[in-house]
Structures are given as C-alpha cells and as structure tokens.
Design a protein with these regions (language model features):
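Active-site loop-to-helix "anion-binding N-cap" substructures in soluble metabolic enzymes
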Residues: 2-127
Length: 127
C-alpha cells in the first residue's frame, strides 16, 4: 500500500498521538493500512475493540475502544455495530460473542493466546 498525500492528510491526527512511540519512517508503512481499515470499518459498520497491550498503531490508529478485558466485554454488549473485531486474545473474542450472540465477532490473529488463561486446568478450577 502506498503512503499517498491523502493518506498522510487523513492519518496525520492519529500520528500526532503516537509520534513519540513510532518514528515517521515506520508510520509511512502503517498509515496506509490504518487509512484503509478505518474506511472499511465505516463501510461495514464495524466496531474495533483493542486490549490495552496492543501496539500504538492499533491502540491509537484503528481501535474504537481500547481498554481491559472487562471494559471491552461491556462495550461489546452495548454496540449497535454489525461486526465486532477483537484485537485481543481468544477468551476476549469469546466473551464478546457471548455478550452479543447475534453479532459476527472476528479475531484477526487466531494464534493470539493468553498465557494466564492457558496455565489454568480443570483441576485448578475444582480445587
């Protein structure tokens, strides 16, 4: 994707929020994707939820809500969007789906896991 003058203009307010974290040379790589994702988000009536640990370009660039897992679940339950995109881990996307069973919930990275959630076993819960 190309870093065009239009992309520069429309994403400049976002870059101002994250310029201390991301060098301008890297921004020129991320900005076209941020621009395209934000356009698609409007076209598809999508809500992007991002966990606090996401990278600056996701957290500030495309997320409608950036918060902890509980706050994201609450936001998922209140949305009027047709599509929920969870930038987080499996259990967060599963929780968003439970809160909104009639909505489509997407998890962009199927490999995203939580070491804490993975470390608990059924035996641990029964104790």
């Amino acid at each position: 994707m190309e870093f065009t003058p239009e992309v520069r203009r429309t994403t400049n307010p976002i870059y101002q929020k994250i310029s201390r974290f991301l060098p301008e040379i890297e921004w020129s790589v991320h900005a076209p994707y941020i621009h395209k994702i934000n356009k698609l988000k409007k076209e598809k009536n999508a809500l992007i939820l991002a966990h606090n640990y996401q990278t600056p370009e996701i957290y500030h660039g495309i997320a409608d809500v950036a918060a902890d897992s509980l706050a994201l679940a609450i936001e998922a339950s209140k949305t009027k969007a047709d599509l929920i995109i969870m930038c987080g881990v499996h259990f967060m996307a599963e929780t968003a789906k439970l809160m909104n069973p009639n909505k489509k919930v997407l998890l962009p990275d199927m490999g995203a896991g939580c070491s804490l959630a993975s470390s608990i076993t059924a035996k641990d819960v029964r104790m």
